[in-house]
Swiss-Prot record:
GO biological process, one term: translation
Subunit and interaction comment: Part of the 50S ribosomal subunit.
UniProt family annotation: Belongs to the universal ribosomal protein uL30 family.
NCBIfam families found in the cross-reference section: rpmD_bact
CDD domains, sorted: Ribosomal_L30
Signal peptide: none
Designated name of the protein: Large ribosomal subunit protein uL30
Annotated organism of origin: Rickettsia typhi (strain ATCC VR-144 / Wilmington)
Pfam families: Ribosomal_L30
Domain of life: Bacteria
Amino acid sequence: MNNKVNNIKITQIKSAIGCKYDQRLTLIGLGLNKINKSVILENTNSIKGMVKKVKHLLEIKNM
């Protein structure tokens, strides 16, 4: 059985100024609030959905 957890590194590359309020809340939920801030999160369905919502503001890398 493979217990390896897939992680993704998410970096905010654009500002949330001018974005909808729910997109700003999504960034905060991902742990991002400043440009060039990065977080490493588990690659779960809920995280994938949040990333998809604000993908135009992010850079995503598999780890």
